[in-house]
Amino acid sequence: MTATLTPTLELAFDLIRRPSVTPVDEGCQELMMRRLAACGFEVERMRIEEVENFWAKRGGDGPVLCFAGHTDVVPTGPLDAWQYQPFDVRVDEEGMLCGRGAADMKGSLASMIVAVERFVADYPNHRGAISFLITSDEEGPAQHGTKAVVERLRERSERLDWCIVGEPSSTTLLGDVVKNGRRGSLGCTLTVYGKQGHVAYPHLAKNPIHLAAPALAELAAEHWDHGNDYFPPTSFQVSNLNSGTGATNVIPGELKAVFNFRFSTESTVEGLQQRVTAILDKHGLDYHLEWALSGLPFLTQPGELLDAVAASIKNVTGRDTTPSTSGGTSDGRFIATLGTQVVELGPVNATIHQINERVLASDLDLLTEVYYQTMVKLLA
């Protein structure tokens, strides 16, 4: 079967068979860097802590189109649950490319490389520049990957006008959805302090569960904002709630609650924090808050990049795309802080992070063509 593979699928095979479980890269970036260097890119390795990253650029003055992505994949889960071994990549009898990373996001990486190789061959003197920002730390803590590389680029005033992130944005058919923004993510660990005691003598103790419950209920019922044309209303979710010693006759001394905001551009970090504090204070709690901001919301309005991507999808697939800001966070949140227009465009996401991850193999060739046509519209 290998002899009949398209160039995009050949590269996808080579990437997927490498077990690059986050933050390990397993030579994926070395393969990509060799291909890019061969078509005139200046390649810069950026190993930060245990994370492999690289920045590559080709071209001169003018607008810069960046392709961004990650070579790391999530853990496989139980191997005996897979129809085929997760790194024993193949195209099955239904034409599906099977393997961990097929959708998220080694298929996109292969499409990017092959599209750029073709574009550079067809337009060796293209205007502006093409760049790549690739990391092995997207599926993990995401502290020493794109986030850290972006800070280095910022320090040296590197220009990034447009960025295509290869995250699997499509829902049912290739290109039916692109992400033109993402909600912000603000997490918090709340500790409510009480006083431990015997359940038979509640007047000698302070039960933090009883004390915290009304406040948590009010937080859960609060309407934080109404959203806008691009974002749904901000959501509040408690993800962990822990208290107690394990004994049935002991009132616990403290309660810990972990919660998360996915917030729109209608809310700010400071505003959400102030409102949480006001509600907790209203209930007279003795508490401590530890906040963790994962990323601010960002939005790419209709313009050069979104228009070029949408037109290319229409030309290649015949369908109109729908811009969306739904879903979780991505590395686009870091790149957007440079003032860059960011669009996420990749294959169907129906099986990402699942057992038996797969995508339609032919979709990767279509994706290659979409990336190619987008470059033609922006840089030819």
Curated annotation (Swiss-Prot):
Superkingdom of the organism of origin: Bacteria
Cofactor(s) of this protein: Zn(2+); Co(2+)
EC number: 3.5.1.18
Binding-site residues, Zn(2+) 1: H70, D104, E167
Residues that hold Zn(2+) 2 according to the record: D104, E139, H353
Pathway stated in the Swiss-Prot or TrEMBL entry: Amino-acid biosynthesis; L-lysine biosynthesis via DAP pathway; LL-2,6-diaminopimelate from (S)-tetrahydrodipicolinate (succinylase route): step 3/3
UniProt GO BP: diaminopimelate biosynthetic process; L-arginine biosynthetic process; lysine biosynthetic process via diaminopimelate
InterPro entries in the cross-refs: ArgE/DapE_CS, Bact_exopeptidase_dim_dom, DapE_proteobac, Peptidase_M20, Peptidase_M20_dimer, Peptidase_M20A
Gene Ontology molecular function: any one: succinyl-diaminopimelate desuccinylase activity
Function: Catalyzes the hydrolysis of N-succinyl-L,L-diaminopimelic acid (SDAP), forming succinate and LL-2,6-diaminopimelate (DAP), an intermediate involved in the bacterial biosynthesis of lysine and meso-diaminopimelic acid, an essential component of bacterial cell walls.
Name used for this protein in its record: Succinyl-diaminopimelate desuccinylase
Native organism: Ectopseudomonas mendocina (strain ymp) (Pseudomonas mendocina)
Organism taxonomic ancestry: Bacteria, Pseudomonadati, Pseudomonadota, Gammaproteobacteria, Pseudomonadales
